[in-house]
């Protein structure tokens, strides 16, 4: 069976492994987008270290879990969002104000909705984590 959404699969794999209590998880196939999402999650303290392992195919990410994720998921369809509308999407996807992050793909790279709001740029919503 083919994998339709690698990002959604990776985030659900991380969430399920956190709930079971695992300390690390292997995510495959690896992609640049998944790597950028993992980088943003690491910068915000949701995961520990992660590394890319080349297996001769698409690659694998090894992610250290620290038990801080309640839920993580991909946002489909990837809604376009303007800089002034982040509050609406926060209310829709996050459980409380200033709790969790929305991950946004912008023209300046992948970042959280808070960074994008500070820079005054919009983009496309790709994931949420809390």
Swiss-Prot record:
Signal peptide: none annotated. Keywords: Ribonucleoprotein, Ribosomal protein, RNA-binding, rRNA-binding. GO terms for cellular component: ribonucleoprotein complex; ribosome. Belongs to the universal ribosomal protein uS8 family. The gene is rps8. NCBIfam families: PRK04034.1 (NF003115). It comes from Thermococcus gammatolerans (strain DSM 15229 / JCM 11827 / EJ3). One of the primary rRNA binding proteins, it binds directly to 16S rRNA central domain where it helps coordinate assembly of the platform of the 30S subunit. GO terms for molecular function: rRNA binding; structural constituent of ribosome. The keyword Ribonucleoprotein applies. This is Small ribosomal subunit protein uS8. InterPro entries: Ribosomal_uS8, Ribosomal_uS8_CS, Ribosomal_uS8_sf. GO terms for biological process: translation. Part of the 30S ribosomal subunit. It comes from the Archaea.
């Amino acid at each position: 069976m083919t994998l339709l959404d690698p990002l959604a699969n990776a985030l659900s794999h991380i969430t399920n492994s956190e709930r079971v209590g695992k300390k690390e998880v292997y995510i495959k196939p690896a992609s640049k987008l998944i790597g950028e999402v993992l980088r943003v999650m690491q910068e915000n303290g949701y995961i520990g270290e992660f590394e890319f392992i080349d297996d001769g195919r698409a690659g694998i990410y090894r992610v250290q879990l620290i038990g801080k994720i309640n839920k993580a998921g991909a946002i489909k369809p990837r809604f376009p969002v303007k800089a002034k509308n982040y509050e609406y999407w926060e209310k829709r996807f996050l459980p409380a104000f200033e709790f969790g992050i929305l991950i946004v793909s912008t023209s300046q790279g992948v970042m959280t909705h808070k960074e994008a709001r500070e820079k005054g740029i919009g983009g496309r919503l790709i994931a949420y984590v809390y």
